């Protein structure tokens, strides 16, 4: 019995060695990437579309052989657009799943909530669409794929004066939302620098549904353009009440408007917004992406899909050039990014903010459907 036990123990030990070796090989054949997005909640359309773009990029890369022979596996988490849930998702991804690369989250508040954790843990975080300037302040492991609010607000102000010829602007913004405040401040600076006058500057709080008091003041100020820097759900409500008040002037906003096409009506016509790319662009790389996205999902990709797609390819390019999965090495290469992506040519400044152009889109009716079409490009 003792001899049998000895051989049984030896056999078990050998089996465990081979099992461990098999697990190690399996794990080494993949690169796990964490993803944090709002797949439910008020801004779910951002997360759902961004994840589609990420999934498409991963499928393409894996079908082409992966990264240095390793297949990418996305481990996605839904944060519902809530910062506390972003933190929980990040902790789960980095402690349980042991990921060292995270794409997300999308809104500025949610992305900001995990930056200090990412920096402290030396986890590369790429925020696809978080435009608040402070996102990358946490340190050198934090990156983003999008332009930032000061540039976006400036684009809106320049467009209003130079393209629309506006002289009198009114602004209606969410005083509790960093994104909205950031765009508003920089729009005002650019509009006034362009010779315009801000005749009304009204605010509201997150969650408000009735904007008639502010809109009455705006109407009485007689602006020839109204700037509304907020997310599509709130913008749809404001635009409806604005038009019901008889305000027919053009309305302008930022990339938070992406999503209006499926959530608003004719009240947003004569509306223009800054965005990261135009789906109707004739650039070959854009059309290839759009064609592949439509083939996979039977719908056109919005900017969040494009930014998610670009985030994966930015990371892929850095890992390939680094020739290793060592996070510090990948970070160093990522800092030197200089390439063409769906949302434009991209390099990083010293704070890891992309230096890239923006487009202005116009909301129109086409074949009976509300859609966004390219209007103009504004360079940094």
Describe the residue ranges of each PLM region.
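Extracellular/periplasmic periplasmic-binding protein-like sensory domains
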Residues: 239-309, 363-364, 370-379
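Short, low-complexity disordered leader/linker segments with a strong preference
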Residues: 1-32, 63, 377-380
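Extracytoplasmic "Venus flytrap"
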Residues: 31-53, 77-84, 106-107, 172-181, ...
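Segments of small-molecule ligand-sensing domains
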Residues: 296-305, 316-370
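Hydrophobic alpha-helical segments within soluble ligand-binding/sensing domains
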Residues: 86, 145-168, 181-183, 210-212, ...
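An alpha-beta-alpha
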Residues: 142-203, 225, 315
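Beta-alpha junction/loop-to-helix N-cap segments that form part of ligand/metal-binding clefts
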Residues: 25-26, 45-52, 64-136, 204-211, ...
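Extracellular/periplasmic bilobed ligand-binding domains
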Residues: 183-274
């Amino acid at each position: 019995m003792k001899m049998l036990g000895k051989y049984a123990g030896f056999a078990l030990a050998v089996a465990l060695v081979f099992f461990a070796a098999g697990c190690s090989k399996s794990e080494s054949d993949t690169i796990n990437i964490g993803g944090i997005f709002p797949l439910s909640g008020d801004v779910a359309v951002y997360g759902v579309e961004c994840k589609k773009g990420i999934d498409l990029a991963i499928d393409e890369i894996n079908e082409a052989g992966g990264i240095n022979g390793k297949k990418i596996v996305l481990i996605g988490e839904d944060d519902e657009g809530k910062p506390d849930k972003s933190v929980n998702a990040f902790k789960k991804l980095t402690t349980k799943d042991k990921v060292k690369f995270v794409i997300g989250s999308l809104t500025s508040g949610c992305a900001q909530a995990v930056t200090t954790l990412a920096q402290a843990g030396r986890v590369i975080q790429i925020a696809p669409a978080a435009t608040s300037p402070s996102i990358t302040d946490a340190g050198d492991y934090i990156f983003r794929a999008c332009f930032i609010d000061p540039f976006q607000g400036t684009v809106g102000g320049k467009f209003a004066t130079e393209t629309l010829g506006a002289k009198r602007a009114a602004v209606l913004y969410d005083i509790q939302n960093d994104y909205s405040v950031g765009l508003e401040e920089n729009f005002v600076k650019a509009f006034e620098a362009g010779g315009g006058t801000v005749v009304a500057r009204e605010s509201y709080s997150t969650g408000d549904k009735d904007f008639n008091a502010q809109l009455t003041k705006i109407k009485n100020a007689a602006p020839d353009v109204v700037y509304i820097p907020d997310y599509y759900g709130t913008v749809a409500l404001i635009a409806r009440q604005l038009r019901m008040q008889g305000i027919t002037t053009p309305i302008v906003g930022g990339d938070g408007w992406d999503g209006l096409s499926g959530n608003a009506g004719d009240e947003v016509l004569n509306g223009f917004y800054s965005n990261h790319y135009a789906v109707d662009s004739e650039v070959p790389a854009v059309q290839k992406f759009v064609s592949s996205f439509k083939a996979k999902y039977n719908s056109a990709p919005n900017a969040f899909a494009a930014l998610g797609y670009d985030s994966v390819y930015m990371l892929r390019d850095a890992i390939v050039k680094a020739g290793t999965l060592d996070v510090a090495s990948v970070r160093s290469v990522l800092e030197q990014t200089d390439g063409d992506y769906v949302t434009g040519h991209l390099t990083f400044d010293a704070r890891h903010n992309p230096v890239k152009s923006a487009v202005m889109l116009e909301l129109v009716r086409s074949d009976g459907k509300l859609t966004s079409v390219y209007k103009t490009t504004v360079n940094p």
